[in-house]
Structure formats: C-alpha cells, structure tokens
Amino acid sequence: MAAKIRRDDEVIVLTGKDKGKRGKVKNVLSSGKVIVEGINLVKKHQKPVPALNQPGGIVEKEAAIQISNLAIFNAATGKADRVGFRFEDGKKVRFFKSNSETIK
C-alpha cells in the first residue's frame, strides 16, 4: 500500500501535547510511526563516551509519533488536509482532497 505521508512532507499534529504544530517529516518507520522535525521532543539521559569524545548529559531529541495523529499540511489552504491517490500519465500520484491539487 502506498504511503499517504512520506519523507520531507510538511505535516500538522492533530492530537497530543504538540497539537497544532507543524514540521517536516524526517523519517517514516515501518511500525506506523514517523519522526517529525521539532515535534514530540523528549529528554534522553546520555552517558559520556570518552572513546568517541562525547560528553554525557541530558539531550533533547525527537521521538516517533503515530501517523494517525498527523495530517498533511496544504499550503494553498493553510489547513490540514486528507490525501487521495490517482493515476496521471500512467503514474500513481498523491493529491489533496480539498482542492484536487497534486502533491509534489
């Protein structure tokens, strides 16, 4: 099945502590989760690694978030949108349901 949300898509968070925030998809995981830039930040306690000259401490990084909690952002309407699929010139492409505009 083709993915409705892919890497480098601009998405908006629908639910949770980051509701309403927008970000760019960095990575799509096979478990139905994605990692979004600047969204779902968690603090990790990291031990120092002297061999690699890495200091220890508390590091903030992005955690995975469920795809169902995200929607693709339509820049033309300025809102979250749903994604559909259609064939154009023999290729399967994604489009916004609200205005039928093809997604890059």
Swiss-Prot record:
> Which keywords, in A-to-Z order, does the entry hold?
Ribonucleoprotein, Ribosomal protein, RNA-binding, rRNA-binding
Identify the SMART domains for this entry.
Answer: KOW
Is Protein biosynthesis among this UniProt entry's keywords? Answer: no
**An individual GO BP term:** translation
Recorded hits in Pfam families, A to Z, give:
KOW (PF00467), ribosomal_L24 (PF17136)
A single GO CC term, please? ribosome
The leader peptide range reads: none
Among CDD domains, the record links this protein to:
KOW_RPL26
Which Gene3D superfamilies does this chain map to? 2.30.30.30
Under Gene Ontology molecular function, one entry of this record is: rRNA binding
| SUPFAM superfamilies (alphabetical) | Translation proteins SH3-like domain (SSF50104)
Domain of life, per the record?
Answer: Bacteria
Family statement: Belongs to the universal ribosomal protein uL24 family.
What does the subunit comment say?
Part of the 50S ribosomal subunit.
Functionally, this protein is described as follows:
One of two assembly initiator proteins, it binds directly to the 5'-end of the 23S rRNA, where it nucleates assembly of the 50S subunit. One of the proteins that surrounds the polypeptide exit tunnel on the outside of the subunit.
HAMAP family the UniProt entry points to? Ribosomal_uL24_B
Q: What's the protein name?
A: Large ribosomal subunit protein uL24
